[in-house]
Amino acid sequence: MMINTGLNNKYQFENFFENDGNDSAKKVARAVVEDLGFYNPLYIYGPSGSGKTHLLQAIGNKVLENNPEKRVKYISAEDLLENELEIQKVRSEEFDLLIVDDIQILGEKDILIQEKFLNLFNSQQYKNKQMVFSSDSEPDQLKSVHSHLIVRFKWGITASLTLLEKLQEGLQMNDQERLLTIFLRLQLGASLGKKQLAHE
């Protein structure tokens, strides 16, 4: 039976934008691909736009490229934690690689859902099945997440990503453009004001 991996083939290591803030995370991600279960779990955190989803998907795509027989699943935390049945379904699949994006959403779920996810984590770990998570903050900064889960997120290796330089440059350029627009409007307003006074 075909598995819905949830992966998008456009996300690859080869087209992942690198800067000084994410080179280490990419190296760790590649190491996970080469030795599934050794760095377990891999926990990647960083702000929106830093490339977390791209890197997570690249891991899954590379694993399947190297080992097509592997059972790989990429899923957003929002979808995984929607209800108990979804968590149980994923647990029963026994994926060789389980990738969960935006795990900070755990903090928005009740204790029952968090406990079900804890059972899923323990099952994967016991069977030495690789897990990869992404979040907007490091494990100790997760809000309203059970302490047992926070401890487990730190069992393997944690890597951080920073905002991509190209995006930062774009944001800075947008700020400059906005300031220039305001300045030109002020200049135009002042010029029109002078003309109006001259005609009066």
Protein language model regions, located:
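AAA+/P-loop NTPase substrate/partner-engagement loops
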Residues: E65-L97, L106
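Conserved P-loop NTPase "ATPase switch" module shared by AAA+ and STAND
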Residues: R91-Q114, L120, Q130-S135
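Conserved AAA+ ATPase "SRH/arginine-finger" region at the nucleotide-binding site
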Residues: G156-Q168
